[in-house]
Amino acid sequence: LLSSIEGQRPEVRVRPPFPVHGGLFRKPTVVNNVETVANLLFICSEGGEAYAAIGTPKSTGTKLVSLDSAFFTPGIFEADMGTPLDLVFKQLGSGFKRAVKAVHIGGPLGGLVPVSKIPDLTLDFESFAQNGFMMGHASVVSVPEEYPMIEYLEHLFSFTAHESCGKCFPCRLGSTRGKELLQKAQNDHNFKIDLKLMDHLLDTMKRGSLC
């Protein structure tokens, strides 16, 4: 975003320096999303300590959760950080209206959570990290029981390959290679993906890409 405003190639930046120290034109810059701005009224009226008292010690405040049409009550809901994820789905979303095998949380680069793991998670960054997931912006996309997971994974790799800014070669090349492997596995029934190769590819992308 900052590079685009400056007229440069829209590429991710190495941090530090963080925007608050050296952002737009290398000057201190505050970059906040609408969720952060929405919390300002409560913080200004009740005080920062009151807001920090909500949630968990490391994930304070509330979180906006977007539930898709697989729920009986879809929509955007605000919940305290630390709320059991199962409670969010059952009380706010009124549960699933069809069989679901996984939920994709936090956008394209977020985590695919099997339904069996939902009771283990709470709505905070630590819980997700400890279980190998990312909460991100907490959007929830449900994967129906009958939908082929390999097709969904191909969609994610295709998105990443298309949206990669190209700065980091593990992301630029790895996303395309992952997409090719998944496409071949679907088109050639005699081909099986080498899981060690796929794990190595994912680990390389994770370690070697800034995003």
What are these regions (language model features)?
Residues 1-81, 93-95:
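Hydrophobic alpha-helical positions that pack around
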Residues 49-62, 96-106, 167-170, 190-198:
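Flexible, glycine/charged-enriched surface loops at secondary-structure junctions
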Residues 95-131:
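Terminal amphipathic helices with adjacent charged low-complexity linkers/tails
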Residues 68-70, 79-80, 91, 103-108, ...:
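Generic beta-strand/beta-sheet core signal
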Residues 1-6, 11-16, 42, 90, ...:
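Short acidic, glycine/serine/threonine-rich loops at helix termini
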Residues 12-15, 121-210:
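Ferredoxin-type iron-sulfur electron-transfer modules in oxidoreductases and energy-metabolism complexes
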Residues 80-87, 148:
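Short, structural beta-strand-to-alpha-helix junction motif
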Residues 1, 105, 109-114, 203-210:
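Short, surface-exposed loop/turn segments at secondary-structure boundaries that line and modulate
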